[in-house]
Amino acid sequence: MSELKDYHILHFVDKFENVIVKVPPTVSLDSIARMYGLGITKFHLSNTLPMTDHNGDGYGISGKRLKDQILPFVESVASFFKLRNTPVSIIAGGGIYKAKDVEDYYNAGATDYSLSTIFFTPWKVPEVLDTIKYINRQ
């Protein structure tokens, strides 16, 4: 996989008003801080965990199995920026299937939420959306 270079980030920040970088938990806080220094203020932490199979081919894990890995990552990134009094948007995704999942991500420092797999069980969606609306009113 090719590495994202600073000039790639600068190009997108200059060209587009809203740039959101999707960051898996394998990326270091130093790399995230570097992206912030280049103008990125919105981070999607992350609805996929990159993996490699026995052939060396890449794929991603998503869904419920991610929450245990993404939740501490959200907390770490949120704390990093909070300690520096630096406002960022943190979009949490991965394993959001019920209101408690949204609350957990909110308490970890998420400002927004990415929903995907939950739409395969549409009867669960209203409760989750109601929780997001409630949190956003606070």
Protein language model annotation of sequence segments:
Residues 1-30:
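Conserved beta-alpha-beta core of the PfkB/ribokinase-like small-molecule kinase fold
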Residues 1-5, 30-88, 125-128:
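Glycine/Thr-rich beta-alpha phosphate-binding loop at enzyme active sites
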Residues 2, 21-24, 62-66, 91-95, ...:
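Glycine- and other small-residue-rich loops at beta-strand/loop junctions that grip anionic moieties
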Residues 8, 17, 82-85, 137:
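Short, flexible coil/linker elements and helix-boundary hinge sites characteristic
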Residues 11-12, 34-35, 131:
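Short, aromatic/basic amphipathic alpha-helical patches
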Residues 26-39, 79-84, 90-113:
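Catalytic cores of alpha/beta
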Residues 42-51, 96, 102-129:
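Glycine-rich phosphate-binding active-site loops on the catalytic face of alpha/beta enzymes
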Residues 130-138:
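Extended, intrinsically disordered, low-complexity segments
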